[in-house]
Design a protein with these regions (language model features):
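Mature hydrolase/peptidase catalytic cores and their serpin-fold inhibitory cores, especially
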Residues: 316, 325-328
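M16 family metallopeptidases and their MPP-like homologs
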Residues: 1-45, 60, 64, 74-99, ...
């Protein structure tokens, strides 16, 4: 019924939750009549949710069923074990279990809403056919009757692993799923762009990356191997991963570790730096080629307290990255002596 009401005025409602925040997205037509109706519905949902008992029960059942199904999948098992090994008791290391969801009642949801969905902690980003004055009016209208709760306290700092660890979990899957990595960095870290370039060379650049050359091209251990850094308000994970035949799992782990270690020790070549920077600079327009992508970038800038000219200076920041900066960033954010490794499905 709710989504039909949005569809009737040509609007779409979306949202999501990650380790740091919940988000609610509204996409609407620019015409005043449809826009205002959609905005009124959106505001009603945000400011006066009633959390009906029957809907809560239905959603709990849906989430529990999804969790139980996911818990049988090797990629989910690997991800949960890796996250727990990396972050321990920190909130970033928590994954919901069916019994956690089962205990939630309507009072819990209402209390969480009243303490975490206040105007003080909200970030509102708007893009489209509107004046600045209109945007300010819309933002004021959206935030006006949100709960008057204090801004939630920031999460505690992440504790780093004290030693390297390797966890092996049996599973009947035909392939072994491998994850390894280390806590990476916060989004506002000065090393963001050097590590961004370094990761592109190591495993973020697809078929031109070091990991693909060593794992796939030279040894045929996997079709795909990758790495990425996922910075949050606190230090997020740096992850390298792949799938391979079970009989090759030991070799694959060894090759990944050696490739990452060599890259951290010696850094990229001049040729790799030139190619990576050119690809990232030339690919920047694809990050902002739609209103949706621009909105996501603007919201991220506001949420992470980044400079307002972040998008304007993005390419210049990439151009300015030196090989020495990449080398220093890799050594500062990847400690091979404390690397976490998880293998699901190994013999």
């Amino acid at each position: 019924m709710l989504f039909r009401s949005f569809a009737d005025v040509g609007a779409q409602l979306g949202g999501g939750v990650d380790d740091d925040k919940a988000s609610f997205k509204l996409r609407t037509l620019s015409s005043a009549r449809e826009r205002d109706k959609a905005l009124d519905l959106y505001i009603k949902i945000l400011q006066k949710p009633d959390f009906p008992g029957d809907v809560l029960a239905r959603e709990k059942a849906r989430v529990i069923a999804g969790l139980k199904e996911a818990a049988t999948q090797p990629e989910t098992i690997a991800d949960k074990a890796y996250t727990k090994a990396l972050f321990g008791s920190h909130p970033y290391g928590f994954d919901a279990e069916p019994e956690n969801i089962e205990k939630i009642d309507r009072y819990d949801v209402q209390k969480f809403y009243s303490t975490h969905y206040g105007a003080q902690g909200a970030v509102i980003a708007l893009i489209g056919d509107m004046s600045r004055e209109q945007a300010e009016q819309f933002a004021e209208k959206i935030s006006l009757d949100l709960p008057r709760a204090d801004k939630p306290a920031p999460l505690a700092a992440v504790s780093y692993p004290v030693a390297a660890s390797e966890q092996r979990i049996s599973h009947p899957a035909t392939q072994a799923h491998i994850l390894m990595g280390y806590p990476g960095m916060k989004r506002g870290d000065p090393d963001f762009f050097p590590l961004y370039v370094g990761n592109y060379i190591l495993g973020g650049g697809g078929f031109v990356s070091r990991l693909v050359k060593e794992v796939r091209e030279k040894r045929g251990l996997a079709y795909s191997v990758y790495s990425y850094v996922s910075p949050g308000r606190q230090v997020g994970p740096y992850v390298a991963g792949m799938q391979t035949q079970k009989s090759q799992a030991d070799l694959a782990v060894d090759v990944m570790k050696k490739t990452i270690s060599e890259f951290v020790d010696h850094g990229p070549t001049d040729e790799e730096m030139i190619a990576a920077k050119n690809n990232l600079i030339n690919g920047f327009p694809l990050r902002i080629d739609s209103n949706r992508k621009i909105l996501e970038n603007v919201a991220s800038i506001a949420w992470n307290d980044l400079p307002l000219d972040t998008l304007d200076t993005w390419r210049d920041q990439l151009k300015a990255v030196t090989k020495e900066q990449v080398n220093a960033a890799l050594k500062a954010h990847l400690d091979m002596n404390r690397m976490v490794t998880v293998v699901v499905g190994a013999p």
